[in-house]
Swiss-Prot record:
Designated name of the protein: Apolipoprotein A-I
UniProt-listed InterPro entries: ApoA_E (IPR000074), Apolipoprotein_A1/A4/E (IPR050163)
Organism in which the protein naturally occurs: Sus scrofa
Gene, per the UniProt record: APOA1
Tissue: Major protein of plasma HDL, also found in chylomicrons. Synthesized predominantly in the intestine and the liver.
One GO CC term on file: low-density lipoprotein particle
Subcellular location(s) per record: Secreted
Positions of modified residues (Methionine sulfoxide): 109, 135
Amino acid sequence: MKAVVLTLAVLFLTGSQARHFWQQDDPQSPWDRVKDFATVYVDAIKDSGRDYVAQFEASALGKHLNLKLLDNWDSLGSTFTKVREQLGPVTQEFWDNLEKETEALRQEMSKDLEEVKKKVQPYLDDFQNKWQEEMETYRQKMAPLGAEFREGARQKVQELQEKLSPLAEELRDRLRAHVEALRQHVAPYSDDLRQRMAARFEALKEGGGSLAEYQAKAQEQLKALGEKAKPALEDLRQGLLPVLENLKVSILAAIDEASKKLNAQ
């Protein structure tokens, strides 16, 4: 199981190169991708959750209970933001160390990816050119039919559709043929890349010393991350206590008020 975790970590780190396999822009670091995703995800949850709380407080029941959930939500959001800022340097250090420890393996895998990319690129360029040629040919064949449609009456619509149908089918068949040709050209290189990756990890697994070393370093980094995260998590717990207590008091007060009104009736 530890080997699987380590393998996934290495794949994730090499993903900063693999995700740009067909692209020309500079790759984003693993930490930047994780940080961006986490920030967007947490902010989305926080914003949507706040909207629900605001809607509830604006309702008749929310006004009657007067739980002040929105104040508690904002306080809770501030606490989470503080904890996230505290954990930022810790998780950054963890990713930096993990990247450093797997540098050699990632370089080998990136080299394999680049080699396959160079072999496949001519087929991709040829496919793109053929695709554009087919679309241009189709556009030229469509031009006179479009003029005929604009000049013709409604009763000619059916006739125009009958003329367009063979052209569309011809384009579809030709594009399918190009896609199939590309698939056949690229398939051997995809299989080769898959075999290379499998061989890399098999060699890592069979080399007991290397694998044990990677596992030990990964465990050490995870342990260090856990130790450094403890203060921030404790701050989170302390920040949650007054929020939960305030919410508890508000709910009990609302229940008590409701009970008194029922008894008075």
